[in-house]
Swiss-Prot record:
Keyword check for Transferase: yes
InterPro entries, alphabetized: ATPase_NBD, Gcp-like_dom, KAE1/TsaD, TsaD
Protein name per the record: tRNA N6-adenosine threonylcarbamoyltransferase
One family name in Pfam for this protein: TsaD
E.C. number: 2.3.1.234
Keyword tags: Acyltransferase, Cytoplasm, Iron, Metal-binding, Transferase, tRNA processing
Reaction(s) this enzyme catalyzes, per UniProt: L-threonylcarbamoyladenylate + adenosine(37) in tRNA = N(6)-L-threonylcarbamoyladenosine(37) in tRNA + AMP + H(+)
Known cofactor(s): Fe(2+)
């Protein structure tokens, strides 16, 4: 079956075609990054209008790439939430109108479930079960995934998401939009331990996380640098050092929490998904991940166990239609109820987990 996927939750318009027998047939994406850059962030009204302009051309582009026509589409999947209300409505209205015209089922998809399943689009796919780290600008959550639709929330950020902390810290440092990616780039030139920031909740027994205090620590460091220099300008190397220290702190917390999740579940496979999954430092750190089962005092230590870690292809780390088409196809195959028109801007992932 050929499923058309539509993503419009924020500032990317994504359309893709997924074939349940042949895999991903085509994938088209338009980013609004340049349009929002002059405002320093996403402007919801502009985002909605641009989605409306892009959806038809992107759909036709995907059909052309796949050598298919509208008549070949068997179902239409769309992002129902969470996201910007107007942006979601643009995609939902288009998906439902197209499905009605084609007399095909429409499949509402949770945006985060799309990210959760995106590594399954890679040539080398993880096997169930696995621990999933969803890490993006809006969410940071750790899940136990035992199969399609079988998810358990293990822990999440109690305040800022990791990606949000990246963006806000970048803004504190005066970096251009989108700041998170620029911060990661500058961190490559930072000196290790020139600054040392706290690792919030890293030693807590649970799998909850917090990043707002880390952002505050950066603000304090920036203010001290400016006061010492008698200038609002932060020296280039100092700025890079702050970026490095911030990134190291975030990645260390994420690594520690995921290791705890592996010990808690007994799983030895990790999937990382979401926009921050493109971060080079995160990929390097998780790529070398091992876990060691705790032993009673005085007993020989267990050998470290290697962990299999999977990331989605870079093209599917950010918002995209391919993950929505895939998630929709999986639910269509399992007989999920379809036909919901409404959008859900504040849809918690906890509502679809066990």
């Amino acid at each position: 079956m050929l499923v058309l996927g539509i993503e419009s939750s924020c500032d990317e318009t994504g359309v893709a075609l997924y074939d349940t027998e042949r895999g991903l047939r085509s994938h088209c994406l338009h980013t609004q990054m340049a349009m929002h850059a002059e405002y320093g962030g996403v402007v919801p009204e502009l985002a909605s209008r641009d989605h409306i302009r892009r959806l038809v051309p992107l759909t036709e582009g995907c059909l052309a790439q796949a050598g298919a026509s509208y008549g070949d589409i068997d179902a239409v999947a769309f992002t129902q939430g969470p996201g910007l209300g107007g942006a979601l409505l643009a995609g939902s209205s288009y998906a439902n109108a197209l499905a009605l015209a084609l007399d095909k089922p429409v499949i509402p998809v949770h945006h985060l479930e799309g990210h959760l399943l995106s590594p399954l689009l890679a040539e080398e796919k993880p096997d169930f079960p696995f621990v999933a780290l969803l890490v993006s600008g809006g969410h940071t959550q750790i899940m136990a995934v035992r199969g399609i639709g079988d998810y358990e929330l293990l822990g999440e950020s109690v305040d800022d998401a990791a990606g949000e902390a990246f963006d806000k810290t970048a803004k504190l440092l005066g970096l251009p939009y989108p700041g998170g990616a620029k911060l990661s780039e500058l961190a490559e030139s930072g000196r290790p331990e020139a600054f040392v920031f706290p690792r919030p909740m890293i030693h807590s027994d649970d799998l909850q996380m917090s990043f707002s205090g880390l952002k505050t620590a950066v603000l304090t460091a920036v203010e001290k640098v400016r006061e010492a220099n008698g200038s609002e300008t932060i020296p280039e190397q100092t700025r890079n050092n702050i970026c490095r220290a911030f990134q190291d702190a975030v990645v260390e917390v994420l690594e520690a929490k995921v290791k705890k999740a592996l010990l808690q579940t007994g799983f030895r496979t990790v999937v990382v998904a979401g926009g921050v999954g493109a971060n080079r430092k995160l990929r390097e750190t998780f790529g070398n991940m091992t876990v060691q089962i705790p032993t009673p005092k005085g007993k020989p230590k267990h050998p470290s166990e290697k962990v299999s870690v999977f990331f989605p292809p870079m093209a599917y780390c950010t918002d995209n239609g391919a993950m929505i088409a895939f998630a929709g196809a999986m639910h269509l195959g399992k007989g999920r109820e379809v036909g919901a028109f409404n959008v859900r801007p504040r849809w918690s992932l906890s509502e679809i987990v066990k």
